Amino acid sequence: MCEKRYDDILLISDLDGTLIPRYEMISEENIRALNAFTAAGGVFAAATGRTPESALPYLDGITVNAPSIFFNGAMLKDLSKNQVLETRTLDGDIWRTFAARVLYQFPRACVEVYTAEHCHVLTPEANDDPRLAGEFYNVDHTNLKTVEDETWLKFFICDAPINLSFVERLAEELGIDKCSTSFYSEANYLEFVPPHTSKGAMAEVLKAMPAYAGRRVIACGDYGNDAELLRMADIGIAPEDASEEAKAAADRIAPPCREPIVPWILREIF
């Protein structure tokens, strides 16, 4: 029997809630399947809202042989060469004004500014989202003035959903909605990235690179921030326990996240 080959496939997967169950590490079954996939000619890239640094521990032992997408589409980075290939940035003083208003009007929120190298938390440690301590984030607790002159890639607010609805109104009031893309990555996570930025948009950049020309894109994701990625793919896949928005954007529904998704893909899709 001939060994199955994947020389024409580019597999792009979200991490949290797709490849990795919440608050856990990647399963051995997924690791083995991914490495078998790349050994047989497949190309694999991660697509995550995480920083490269916080994603790396979850990718330990996996062959990531294509540039990966970070900050929900604001960065494309080749991890093997530690080289940033593309970034999208939040430009203008309006972002500093918006951040100051959010800090003043939502004192219980966890407010984070992401630069290429760091996650800067602008709020007291008492407000920290639990994921910061448990998911390999290198956190810099600081203040807005300290990061005003940095180059921002992503602005993130963790708060109760009702409060985030008022943050959205504030964004409209200040015109932030006209100079950004915003989305929920969880019910209590509201994120702002540069205009026309998404995992899907950066995946188009990756797909167009000469090294991957002609490969079919198989993409996996579980939440609204994955929807464009799922739609741009030749085959978009969402776990059974994904959000309704993600499932509506997908072509195929995989078993729930706790069941390893990559063996299922290799068995059911190819």
Please give the residue ranges for each predicted region.
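Mg2+-dependent phosphoryl-transfer enzymes with acidic/Ser/Thr/Gly-rich catalytic loops
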Residues: C2-L10, S27, E191-F270
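Active-site metal-binding loops of divalent metal-dependent hydrolases
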Residues: L15, R50, G221-Y223
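Active-site phosphate-binding/coordination module
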Residues: Y23-D128
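Short active-site oxyanion
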Residues: G41-A45, V64-A66, L153-K154, R215-R216, ...
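Hydrophobic packing residues within well-ordered alpha-helices of enzyme cores
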Residues: A55-L59, V167, A246, V262
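Short, structured coil segments at secondary-structure junctions
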Residues: I62-V64, N72, S80, L174-K178, ...
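Short hydrophobic/aromatic-enriched beta-strand-loop microsegments
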Residues: N65-F71, R88, L132-G134, G236-D241, ...
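Conserved acidic, metal-coordinating active-site core of Asp-based
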Residues: R108-C220, G224-N225, L229
